[in-house]
């Protein structure tokens, strides 16, 4: 594993499906100054779409004549849709015009969100959420672009700025979504999200650099290349598995939190009050720039180890938080700090370990969201059968799996270091 992502030399691969012309025209003037802030804002809005349903579950259940725990699977549908969109659309960032792709996906997501707002049943709502989430892959098309354009010694910090936008969107979905849902109804929240997605998605597409690309090979060559790319890169594989464990633990806890906070057996809060709890997620937005600096300085491995230690500490605090609000608040801060630090480190590594950053980023994010979707799917039944303690058990199991599974395949740098020490020992013996 590279000691610092900013100094990594991408390994050669045969993945790229397009030849990039060097004459691409980038943003200039005011557009250049707005480039990173607008991308971060667009990332926040589009990321929020994936999590809109979670804080609105009690309102959706009431409107559909059901219970919150019975419709909790909608949160998993959103994450599965996002993972599917990543598989099919994110690899296209290496082979097609990103301006057109961002604009098209933004319009598809807008239409799906409006359809969700008009849904008469959970089946139709789930279908609309699935499509909206699949089209909400714009952030993962933009992160590789930001990494490409950033100076080498500030790459992780620029990536961290976009990730800070992503987690701000997650917080906004819970806080503002809960408040707006309580005031205007859950359907109005989806309409508002559709408007913001259209405006910011098209604005972001407008300021993206003009790219002249000549595609070679099938359109979805990047998708086909993912398994081989992960197999050839131990560093990428390690980042994928560890983030799947971390994101799965966070997802199990965070998507089930509304059930603990709003149901009578828990804290019995209103949807609006429970949504305010999402403000603790702002810890992620604060930690992201700090984590970027730490990755640039100390390398990804140390940051990921520290993040896993924080997450492991948060799980017993979450369990205690089933009865003690102070413990729940502390755990929420810790798990968000752990998630974003791990994400910045692992994603920077994924973007710099191969010569096909969009495809590598797809593999990384799909792994994370697949882990999150599966953990969320298990957390709902766990809450129904064993209460909040069952959810905490799912989160703990995901952390253990994410860490121990990577121990059987050391990273490239670790193997290289051991080989170098062996060579030096032999030479000194001679």
UniProtKB/Swiss-Prot annotation:
Residues 1-26 are annotated as: Disordered. GO terms for molecular function: transmembrane transporter activity. Residues 1-17 have a biased composition (Low complexity). The chain crosses the membrane at residues 34-54, 70-90, 101-121, 126-146, 159-179, 188-208, 244-264, 275-295, 315-335, 362-382, 383-403. Keywords: Cell membrane, Membrane, Transmembrane, Transmembrane helix, Transport. InterPro entries: MFS (IPR011701), MFS_dom (IPR020846), MFS_trans_sf (IPR036259). Pfam families: MFS_1. Induction: Transcriptionally regulated by SCO4008. It is a multi-pass membrane protein. One of its GO terms (cellular component) is plasma membrane. It is found in: Cell membrane. PANTHER family: MAJOR FACILITATOR SUPERFAMILY (MFS) PROFILE DOMAIN-CONTAINING PROTEIN, TRANSPORTER SCO4007-RELATED. Belongs to the major facilitator superfamily. This is Probable transporter SCO4007. It comes from Streptomyces coelicolor (strain ATCC BAA-471 / A3(2) / M145).
């Amino acid at each position: 594993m590279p000691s610092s992502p900013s100094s990594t030399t991408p390994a050669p691969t045969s993945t790229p499906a397009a030849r990039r012309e060097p004459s691409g025209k980038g943003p200039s003037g005011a557009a250049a100054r707005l480039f990173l802030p607008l991308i971060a804002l667009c990332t926040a809005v589009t990321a929020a779409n994936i999590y809109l349903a979670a804080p609105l579950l009690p309102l959706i259940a009431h409107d559909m004549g059901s219970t919150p725990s019975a419709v909790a699977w909608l949160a998993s549908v959103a994450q599965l849709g996002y993972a599917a969109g990543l598989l099919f659309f994110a690899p296209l960032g290496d082979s097609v015009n990103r301006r057109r792709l961002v604009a098209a996906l933004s319009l598809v997501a807008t239409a799906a969100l409006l359809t969700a707002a008009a849904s008469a049943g959970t089946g139709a709502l789930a279908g609309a959420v699935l499509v909206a989430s699949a089209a909400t892959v714009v952030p993962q098309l933009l992160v590789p672009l930001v990494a490409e354009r950033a100076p080498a010694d500030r790459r992780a910090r620029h990536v961290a700025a976009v990730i800070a936008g992503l987690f701000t969107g997650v917080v906004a979905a819970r806080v503002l979504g809960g408040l707006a849902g309580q005031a205007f109804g859950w359907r109005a929240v989806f309409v508002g999200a559709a408007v913001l997605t259209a405006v910011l998605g098209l604005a972001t597409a407008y300021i993206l650099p003009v790219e002249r690309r000549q595609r070679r090979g099938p359109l979805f060559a990047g998708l086909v290349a993912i398994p081989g790319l992960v197999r050839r890169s131990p560093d990428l594989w390690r980042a994928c598995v560890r983030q799947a464990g971390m994101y799965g633990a966070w997802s199990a806890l965070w998507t089930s939190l509304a059930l603990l906070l709003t149901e009578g057996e828990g804290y019995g809060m209103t949807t609006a009050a429970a949504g305010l709890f999402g403000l603790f997620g702002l810890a992620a937005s604060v930690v992201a720039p700090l984590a970027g600096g730490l990755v640039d300085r100390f390398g990804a491995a140390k940051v990921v180890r520290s993040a896993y230690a924080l997450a492991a500490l948060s799980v017993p605090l979450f369990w205690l938080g089933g009865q003690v609000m102070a413990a729940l608040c502390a755990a929420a801060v810790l798990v968000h700090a752990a998630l974003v630090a791990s994400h910045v480190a692992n994603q920077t590594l994924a973007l710099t370990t191969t010569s096909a950053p969009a495809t590598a980023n797809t593999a990384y994010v799909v792994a994370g969201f697949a882990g999150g979707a599966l953990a969320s799917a298990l957390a709902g039944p766990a809450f129904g059968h064993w209460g909040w303690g069952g959810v905490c058990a799912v989160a703990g199991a995901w952390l253990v799996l994410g860490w121990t599974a990577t121990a059987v395949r050391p990273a490239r740098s670790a193997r290289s270091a051991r080989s170098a020490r062996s060579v030096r020992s032999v030479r000194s013996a001679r």
